[in-house]
A protein has these predicted regions:
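RNA/tRNA-interacting regions in translation and RNA-turnover enzymes
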Residues: 1-168
Length: 168
C-alpha cells in the first residue's frame, strides 16, 4: 500500500529513497526475504508525539508505533543493539561488521524527579493502599522511591516520558 506523506512525517532513507516511516512501519524494500544476505540493524528513538500523529494520520498502527508513542529510553537502545549483535555472533547466525554509527542528536532526556504523598496516591486510586505496597509497586516499575514520612521522592525512568505529574 502507498501512503501520501507530508513534511511533518519523519522517514528513514537509504540515501536515495525512503525505506521506512520512522517509528511506524518499514517499507517493502526493507523486508528480510529468503535470499537476504546482508542486514542493517537500527535502534533509534523518535519523538513520541510525531510518531503518534503520523500513525494516526496514516491509519497505520503497528507494534513499533505503539512502543514509540509511549516513549523509548534512548539508553536502552544502545543496550538492545549491543545485545542483539552479541547474540548474532554468539549463536552463529551471522558475522557482525565492525562498522557502527551513532547519530545521537544530543536531545537527551534529563533525569527527572517527582515528589508525591501516599495520601495523593491513594486519592487518585480511590482506595487505601499501604505505603509498603506502594513502594513495592513503584520499585518494580523502576521509580526508585525514597520515603520521607508521608512523602515519596521518585526517580522517573528516562523511558517514561509520559510522566508529567503524580496522577500519571
Amino acid at each position: 500500500k502507498e501512503y501520501t506523506l507530508d513534511s511533518s512525517n519523519l522517514v528513514i532513507c537509504d540515501g536515495v529513497k525512503p525505506v521506512a516511516i520512522a517509528g511506524v512501519m518499514g517499507g517493502l524494500n526493507s523486508e528480510i526475504r529468503d535470499n537476504t544476505s546482508e542486514v542493517m540493524f537500527e535502534c533509534a528513538k523518535f519523538a513520541r508525539d510525531n510518531v503518534r500523529k503520523t500513525s494516526r494520520a496514516l491509519g497505520l498502527i503497528s507494534d513499533a508505533s505503539s512502543r514509540y508513542s509511549k516513549g523509548v529510553d534512548e539508553y536502552a537502545t544502545v543496550m538492545a543493539i549491543d545485545r542483539a549483535l552479541h547474540l548474532i555472533e554468539e549463536l552463529g547466525c551471522g558475522k557482525v561488521s565492525s562498522t557502527r554509527v551513532d547519530a545521537n542528536t544530543g536531545n537527551s532526556v534529563e533525569p527527572r524527579e517527582m515528589k508525591v504523598s501516599t495520601a495523593k496516591v491513594n486519592g487518585v486510586l480511590g482506595i487505601e493502599v499501604p505505603t509498603e505496597e506502594i513502594i513495592r509497586i513503584l520499585t518494580n516499575l523502576n521509580f526508585a522511591p525514597v520515603v520521607n514520612g508521608d512523602e515519596l521522592t521518585l526517580q522517573i525512568p528516562a523511558y517514561r516520558e509520559d510522566m508529567e505529574s503524580y496522577p500519571d
